[in-house]
């Protein structure tokens, strides 16, 4: 789930993010200015090992296999989705020994001992501003035929915006892009051979809600503004810090 680490740093949960260049296509490192990027994994891990003595906690997002590179009492694990769904039983068993968080509630089925930590929303960037019209759904290129068909069966007027390497919307430009529209369809799927609808709102769906769009879900309902409080970055980070300290 892109940008979670940077947003959490912005609101007080650390001051540095280490990231592979290939994983930040939306420019979070440029917007928040807390990220060191690396061309290869070996360089990233070495840098993390070199600086870990200066930090009380090492927060690892998704890639739990690297927990063994750091003192056990410092490691905190946060999982976001696809990577966790693909973990084998041995790795799932091993993470039980660490503080674990998941950013969507369905992942509690895999890690029932984890704590649900909603994905944070930066409300300084995403402020109510909508003046647009029409319908938009931002979704993936993978299995597009299946995903687009399912969405348009319920929302026939929606424009399907395919997010791929050539059509990435920069993070700082997302408010302006979304504000062109009045309605956002927030319907995401697993990457299974037969995709399954995901139950929780996506980061983009919450961002659209904060901008004042009407956000529609997979069941034909709309997202409640109360979700903005649940995902508010200040509250999310405070809860996270309370849990790990």
Residues of each region from the PLM?
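Conserved donor-binding/catalytic loop of nucleotide-activated donor transferases
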Residues: 179-181, 204-214
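A short, histidine- and acid-enriched strand-loop-helix "catalytic/donor-clamping" loop
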Residues: 64-67, 76-90, 106
């Amino acid at each position: 789930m892109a940008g979670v680490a940077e947003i959490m740093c912005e609101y007080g949960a650390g001051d540095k993010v280490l990231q592979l260049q290939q994983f930040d296509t939306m420019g979070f490192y440029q917007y928040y200015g807390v990220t060191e990027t690396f061309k290869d994994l070996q360089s990233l891990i070495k840098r993390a090992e070199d600086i870990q003595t200066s930090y009380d906690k090492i927060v690892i997002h998704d890639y739990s296999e690297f927990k063994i590179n750091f003192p056990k009492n410092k490691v905190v694990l946060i999982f976001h989705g696809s990577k966790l769904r693909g973990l084998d039983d041995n790795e799932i068993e091993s993470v039980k020994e660490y503080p674990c968080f998941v950013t969507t509630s369905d992942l509690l089925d895999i890690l029932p001992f984890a704590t649900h930590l909603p994905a944070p929303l930066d409300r300084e960037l995403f402020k109510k501003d909508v003046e647009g019209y029409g319908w938009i759904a931002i979704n993936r290129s993978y299995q597009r035929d299946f995903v687009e068909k399912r969405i348009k069966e319920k929302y026939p007027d929606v424009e399907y915006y395919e997010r791929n390497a050539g059509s990435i919307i920069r993070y700082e430009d997302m408010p302006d892009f979304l504000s062109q529209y009045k309605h956002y369809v927030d319907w995401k799927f697993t990457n299974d051979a037969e995709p399954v609808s995901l139950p929780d709102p996506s980061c983009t769906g919450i961002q659209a809600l904060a901008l004042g769009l009407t956000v529609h879900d997979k069941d034909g309902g709309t997202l409640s503004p109360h979700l903005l409080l649940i995902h508010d970055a200040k509250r999310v980070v405070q809860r996270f810090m309370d849990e790990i300290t």
